[in-house]
Swiss-Prot record:
Disruption phenotype: Larval lethality. Mechanosensory neurons are born and develop normally. However, cre-mediated knockdown targeted to mechanosensory neurons severely impairs axon regrowth of mechanosensory PLM neurons after injury.
Region (Disordered): 1-62, 485-514
Gene: ima-3
Disulfide bonds listed in the record: none
Pfam families assigned: Arm (PF00514), Arm_3 (PF16186), IBB (PF01749)
Record domain IBB: where: 1-51
Family: Belongs to the importin alpha family.
Name of the protein in question: Importin subunit alpha-3
Compartment annotation: Cytoplasm; Nucleus
Taxonomy of the source species: Eukaryota, Metazoa, Ecdysozoa, Nematoda, Chromadorea
One cellular-component annotation, GO: nucleus
Amino acid sequence: MSSNRQAYYKNNAKEQIGKEKRNEEVVSIRKDKREEAISKRRNINTQIEDDSETSTTPPGPFDANLLRLTVAAAQSSDPAEQLTAVQQARKMLSTDRNPPIDDLIGSGILPVLVQCLSSTDPNLQFEAAWALTNIASGTSEQTQAVVNAGAVPLFLQLLSCGNLNVCEQSVWALGNIIGDGPHFRDYCLELGILQPLLQFINPEIPIGFLRNVTWVIVNLCRCKDPAPSPAVVRTILPALSLLIHHQDTNILIDTVWALSYLTDGGNEHIQMVIEAQVVTHLVPLLGHVDVKVQTAALRAVGNIVTGTDEQTQLVLDSGVLRFMPGLLAHYKEKINKEAVWFVSNITAGNQQQVQDVFDAGIMPMIIHLLDRGDFPTQKEAAWAISNVTISGRPNQVEQMVKLGVLRPFCAMLSCTDSQIIQVVLDGINNILKMAGEAAEQVTSEIEECGGLDKIENLQNHENEDIYKLAFEIIDNFFSSDDETGNVEGAQSSAFGGDVPPVPDAPNGGWNFGK
């Protein structure tokens, strides 16, 4: 196997390098730019409107003249007139569709709204904060405009103002600013957001407010380019350790997503999460009744097992594999895929960890998904199988062969994903090398299922590594010039060698349902 192919796997002489490479190579699977939790939100709540207002009436066309009058009135020395004007600006920004954010920014009202945050009137502060929240919910340029107007230091001051409505709206606004990316996240952290934010995690805070606080914590954890500093993570983790016990499903979902983002920050962050002793609370959430909780928990524990073997073992010791049958058979294909990804990282561990997968009885399910799953799930299953051929013992590989892995494995050679083709070819090559005296039986099965034809065709593939490996397999194992069982690199006995011998198959064949 060429060195660049070895780097795809996370278990070889340079195991940890392989883990990192494996994770880099499959970023499209679960560490892509898609957002599982919403990073920005607008406040369009109309419950505080007067009874005389009809909140269900759709807004009319944008009135530029009204905006001009509103901006002028917002600078009035009459407190009542000013409050009405700021409230009108907020209403313009609280429409369900296409709020005129750019029009309001262009009108020059931003500095006025920011100045209102320093008012002694909580109602004016609240309305201004609401308007700014919705402006900051827009594009990066619109969020930048709010920051440039000097809103962030004032929002941070308002976190200690004592008025819960103003505090909550300020938290919401800061959440939108932080959610724009790591630059604004770090800016808010430098200005000291953490301690005043975390003080709201207490039993006296209304549930809606606590949901917003938890959502802001998610945004603080979200970005990884760069990831939050270790000092920030250590400060946040005690709060997450409390929130993971909360009975509110929305808070629980955001808490687990926050942990999933932290565990996506590398082995150091993974270790901090482990030391916070939340893993034993994370793992049972894989069986939660809410699929959103399951999804977030699966991502979090999946990120942890991309770490070291020791970090992986802690998750295994928490009983995670007992949840895998339900996740692998889940009605949502996305969960199937992520569950197989999780297993692929276990099969890339040490030999005992590979054996744990077999002992859990889930290898037949992996092979079934390799055969019948959607293509993203099949790709993850191909990784899981190939990792066994590198990490596992020959008897474990033999068990996969007995479970019928070769036909669906060879079928993946017809896909258009060059990386997966290479992964499968490596796996086939490894299986044949381990087979020893049983290599002839394995080659016969590969030929019967059409795998040989596919390998022969791949000798013409445009990818150099693929066509060279295809040629190598044909030359070593399917050439009439050689005795199949005696080729260089093959084990001298059937799936044996200098590793523990393969136990005899029991009557009726192997049973991995236990």
